[in-house]
C-alpha cells in the first residue's frame, strides 16, 4: 500500500514521500502523461507501468510486509498481489535512491498542465 511504499522511500532516500515524491514531475503522484522530466520522474513512470501490469490488484491499498536484510529490502511472502506490489515499490524506492544526485526541487509540486503528450509503457 501507499503506507509501505512511503516507508521504503524514506528508508532508501532519507526523504518523506510527501512532499518530495507525491507530486514530482509528470509521473510521481496520481496519473501521469508526457515525457518524464528527469531520472526521478522516470522512476515514477516505470513504477506506474509496473502497477499497470497488476490489473487484478489494488496497489495503493493492498498491504504487504517487507524487511531489511543487511540494508536491502526483502519482500516477505504474501499473496501473489502483495508480492508483486512489493516488488514494484521496492524497485521504485531503489531507483529514487540511485537518482538522488539529480533530484531537482523545480519539479516538486510540478503543475499538471505542463505535462503534455502520451508515453506508452
Swiss-Prot record:
How is the cofactor bound, as the UniProt entry phrases it? Answer: Binds 1 Ca(2+) ion.
The listed locations are: Secreted
What tissues contain this protein? Expressed by the venom gland.
Major location category of this protein: secreted
Query: Cross-referenced InterPro entries, in alphabetical order?
Result: PLipase_A2 (IPR001211), PLipase_A2_Asp_AS (IPR033112), PLipase_A2_dom (IPR016090), PLipase_A2_dom_sf (IPR036444), PLipase_A2_His_AS (IPR033113)
- GO molecular function ontology, one term from the record: calcium ion binding
Please give the superkingdom of this protein's source.
Eukaryota
Gene3D superfamilies, alphabetized: Phospholipase A2 domain
Q: Which reaction does it catalyse?
A: a 1,2-diacyl-sn-glycero-3-phosphocholine + H2O = a 1-acyl-sn-glycero-3-phosphocholine + a fatty acid + H(+)
Query: Cross-referenced SUPFAM superfamilies, in alphabetical order?
Result: Phospholipase A2, PLA2
Keyword Calcium, does the record have it?
yes
Signal peptide segment: none
Task: Give GO BP annotations, semicolon-separated.
Answer: arachidonate secretion; lipid catabolic process; negative regulation of T cell proliferation; phospholipid metabolic process
Q: Which Cys residues form disulphide pairs?
A: 26-115, 28-44, 43-95, 49-121, 50-88, 57-81, 75-86
Which residues catalyse the reaction?
47, 89
- One Pfam family this sequence matches: Phospholip_A2_1
Q: What is its EC number?
A: 3.1.1.4
Keyword field: Calcium, Disulfide bond, Hydrolase, Lipid degradation, Lipid metabolism, Metal-binding, Secreted
Q: Which GO terms describe its cellular component?
A: extracellular region
Asked whether the keyword Transmembrane is assigned, the reply is no
Record-annotated residues binding Ca(2+)? 27, 29, 31, 48
Q: Which cofactor does it need?
A: Ca(2+)
Enzyme type, top EC level: hydrolase
- Sequence similarity: Belongs to the phospholipase A2 family. Group II subfamily. D49 sub-subfamily.
Q: What does this protein do?
A: PLA2 catalyzes the calcium-dependent hydrolysis of the 2-acyl groups in 3-sn-phosphoglycerides.
Q: What is this protein called?
A: Basic phospholipase A2 3
Q: Which organism is it from?
A: Daboia russelii
Name the lineage. Eukaryota, Metazoa, Chordata, Craniata, Vertebrata
